[in-house]
């Protein structure tokens, strides 16, 4: 996938950010969307303790050439924030909700831009649907055992064994 130069000057209706809410797994998921759905899609997964708001300046720039989707994960931003008794705030569960969210808005082929807390969620999406992910762009993605356990279990078990032997 090539990434054309961005033109921040263009500001037509295709680059206007749309603010929406989608009901997924009993939760209201808030998201920002811009660009034409006929273009390649980039899904932006935010960090902790942030929300899709962190991408407010990036979304219009990307939307000149891409369809951009940035959701607030459950417990963040304008999405529902159920109590820990009502919702399992694990990376596995967050990834499951985000997977169902993307299905519900008919996004089935996309690149992911992952940052911080969004990295373990994005990697789980990739493990579940490698055929859907066209590219992974990471910015300061979390790289600790809890966040990457299922990823490292598939990719580099010797790395985990070396880490355990040092402790």
Segment roles from a protein language model:
Residues 53-56, 60, 96, 123:
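Surface-exposed alpha-helical interface segments used for non-catalytic interactions
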Residues 44-47, 70:
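Structural cue for short, hydrophobic secondary-structure segments
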Residues 57-66, 104:
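A short, Lys/Arg-enriched amphipathic alpha-helix followed by its capping loop at the start of a domain
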Residues 46, 50, 115:
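Conserved coupling/switch loop of ABC ATPases
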Residues 3-29, 34-41, 69, 76-113, ...:
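Flexible "cap/lid" subdomain of the alpha/beta-hydrolase fold that forms the substrate-access gate
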Residues 38, 49-57, 68:
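Serine-hydrolase catalytic-loop signature spanning alpha/beta hydrolases and amidase-signature enzymes
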Residues 54, 73-76:
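Recognition helices and adjacent regulatory flanks at domain boundaries
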């Amino acid at each position: 996938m090539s990434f054309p130069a961005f033109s921040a000057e263009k500001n037509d209706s295709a680059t206007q950010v749309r603010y929406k809410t989608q009901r997924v797994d009993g939760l209201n998921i808030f998201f920002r969307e811009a660009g034409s759905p006929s273009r390649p899609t980039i899904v932006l997964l935010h960090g902790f303790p942030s929300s899709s708001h962190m991408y407010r300046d990036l979304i219009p720039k990307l939307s000149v050439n891409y369809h951009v989707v940035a959701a607030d994960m459950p417990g963040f931003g304008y999405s529902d924030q159920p109590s820990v008794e009502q919702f399992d705030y694990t990376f596995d569960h967050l990834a499951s909700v985000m997977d169902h969210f993307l299905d519900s808005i008919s996004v089935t082929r996309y690149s992911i831009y992952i940052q911080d807390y969004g990295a373990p969620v994005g990697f789980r999406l990739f493990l579940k649907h490698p055929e859907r992910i066209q590219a992974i762009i990471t910015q300061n993605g979390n790289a600790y055992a809890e966040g990457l356990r299922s990823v490292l279990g598939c990719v580099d078990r010797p790395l985990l064994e070396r880490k355990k032997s040092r402790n």
